[in-house]
C-alpha cells in the first residue's frame, strides 16, 4: 500500500473506528473518568462493562482489575508509559481536552507539551492514567500530513 504525502493521510482517515477493551477496577470510577472528566459519551453497558465513544472509536472498560505493570521507556527525557493508547486529535480539540483535564485536576504523567517544535512532525502531546492505571496519550499535529514524518 502506497503511503506518501497528503493522499496517505486521507487514506488513513478513512479507516473504520477501532475497538479497544481494557481492565478497570471499578465501573463507577471509569464512568467518572472517561465520561465526566474526558467527556466521552457512554454507550451500552452491563454490570461488568461499559462502552464509551472515544472520539468516534469504541473503547470498553471491563471490570477485572487494573492495568498491572507500569513499565516505561525513556523518550525525550521523559518516562513514557508502555503500553498506552490514545487518539490523534485536531489541535483545537487537543487544547480543549488539555484545558479540561487540567481544570479537573488530572495528574499528568507528561504534562501537555509540544514536541519537535518547528520541525516536521511537530506535535502536541500529553500522557495521563485513568484511575485503574491505564496509560493514555492524546496528541495533535501542527500539520496532520506529518503524522508519519521522519
Segments from the language model and where they lie:
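Short alpha-helical
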Residues: 28-29, 92
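Short, Lys/Arg-enriched N-terminal segments with co-localized hydrophobic residues
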Residues: 3-12
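Conserved active-site tyrosine of GNAT-family acetyltransferases
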Residues: 30-35, 101, 133
